[in-house]
Amino acid sequence: MNSHRGGIGAGLGLLLLAGHAMAASGEPDYRFKGKISRNVLENYLSRSITMTELYRSPGNLEDDLRMLKNIGAKFVGRAIYLWGGEARIADPQFLAQGREMVSRIHRNDPDVVVQAAAFEIVTEGIGKVPVPGWVFREFGQKPESRNFDYAKMLFPDKKMVDHWRRGSSVPDICQVETKMWFFFLAASYMNIGIEAIHFGQLDLMGRNDRQYRNWADLLKHVRGYAARKARRKFLICDAHVPRAGPVVDGRLLLDFHSFPLRPKEVADSPQKAVLAVGYSDALYGRSNGGTTPSGWRCEHLPYLVEFDNFGGTRAPGQSSQARGPSIFTWGFDEITWFAWQPEGYRNEWLHYAWNWLKEHDRNGFLQMPGGRMLTNGPPSAEAGGGRIRWYFANAKSAACPQGFSQEETIKAIWDEDTRK
């Protein structure tokens, strides 16, 4: 297997400077079509930011787009998705909003990859969404006039049924109906210009697919559609990988891996946290390798780590790790813990995490927090005396009064990285 950095084809007229694939112009290279090289992929991951549900921005879309342009973002994560409420995709407005968002981002910078997500949830409301004929044909079935069938997506042993709440379950990837749904979602997103999809908790949906054969089958269909219809004839696929990433017969199923940051509390410094190889189920140093969907080989697939959101404990602000590893940090999920910190420490911590990854695992990249929901967020006068429900990296201003002001720090980190 190759070492971390692979060679670059001279025919593309590229240079490798400071770990970045550079075009002949001297700018980082973001060109791909039909497949993506490791260096171009890493250029994107190194300029990645989470912008949850940007298509219907909970803040100010104009200011969000301004921020993305200002900082030079190249990979805009989780910009459109469904968490339940599947009937929305049957409403033309949903995809129209998504298409307009993608178009506006590309007017500012056509190189940007905009990511959607297909998560580990289906609800009874999925029965309101018609199955198109082309989805039946993709899976070798005769088209019929019907809607997606919630019951056909569930685990036969009833595990994970009503997992999220009554009528809201984790789908079983081994079921053809589940594959049809995810294929339909992926194709619908590609049709509006989406070029990457995060497939959520892949192992949760694949608890009966330990060899990943069903995931491989789904992704074969998705990649086939991308080769015909996607903006650059390729879809960049990832998922959360607690088992370090799916490999089938030596071939990686995903283009990069993703996982939460898993901050470790500093026991004698309340609210402080660090990163550590080997802590809990953190991905550092253990991302699986193999042959990628684009054909290059690696010992460890590049990956993103993100400030995840998943709830909190009954003791917010108190240690969650005193008795051992926990996914919670000082009683909060990761993005909520981050939001509770003073502005100076938030900025310091972004520098710290960026540099820590460079030192401890150069296969890993920090996905900057741009926009994400909070659980039990900090109180704020701007929230009408209540708690802030959303983290915005935007500089605090009249356009974004609840901005947490990491915008210029993110820009400075990326600018410094470009100069190296």
Model-derived features: where do they sit?
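Glycan-processing catalytic domains of CAZymes
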Residues: 25-420
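N-terminal processing/targeting junctions
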Residues: 21-23
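Bacterial N-terminal signal peptides
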Residues: 10-19
